[in-house]
Structures are given as structure tokens and as C-alpha cells.
Amino acid sequence: MQLFANSCYNKVDFKINENKSAQDAVTQFSAFNIGCLAVTDESNKVVGVCSERDYINKVAAFGKHNTQAKVKDICTYGPKIIVAHPEDSLDVCMRKMLFRDIRHLIIMTPENNECVGMLSIRDLIKATMKDKNETIARLSDFKLGKGGFFGSE
């Protein structure tokens, strides 16, 4: 399933360099109405994630000014990052988010570990609603004798 094809992150720059200021991250959050950024190193490799929660927990909570803090000071690095793969199902992505109580998943290709997108909990809710509405429509059509079930077209 190409879940991330309809993601709100497909149309925006969702990456930020780890040496940028926390203020730059907040500016991107606000400009694109998103809540998470993939953090990259100098070679543009994804090394972490920076979310609104990271900002609140690490900048605002410690009284730092966001012009002083760098993205690398507040982001989540390494093995703590939970990722999805392009072929992951809606259910798999939802379980990953619920297991770690997170609201965003970076989409990484398993072959070369390349970041190809990002999913938000909002994207998963929209996909779930679409699936449920399609199921309801099919069942309603079946009940009414429509939809080609058992040659009743």
C-alpha cells in the first residue's frame, strides 16, 4: 500500500540540517503546518527526527532561547527512531506509532536506507476513514443487491 502517497509531507520540505537553529525548525513547522522534521547530517543522510514534542520538552522546558539551541541539541537520534517502509500496511504503521506513542514515521527504503517520505497520525486516520467508508459502501451495496455480488449487477 502506498500510504505515504497522500501524506501531507509529500508537498513540503520535511528535512532540516542538524546544525540549523531550533528556531529554523519551528519556522518550518509553522510554514508547512507540520509537526515533525527528518534531521539530516552534512551528507544529507537522515540521522534523526525533530518534533514539536522535542522542541517543547528540550527547549521550552529548560528555558533555552530557540535561537541558541541547535536542532542537534533537541532532536531524537539513532536507534530510538522508528521508521516505516514503503510496503508497510496501514495496520503495521499504526502499531508502530502506538507502540512508541509517536505521531510521525519516517519512510525509509529497506534496500539503501533512503528517506522517501514521512507519515503523520493524521495521514493514518484519513486512510483508515477512507478504508472504513469504502467497506460501508460495499456492504450497503451488497445489502441492496448492487455491486456485482453473485451476478446481481
Residue ranges and their predicted role:
Residues G48-S51, R103, V116-I125:
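Short hydrophobic beta-strand motif reused across regulatory alpha/beta modules
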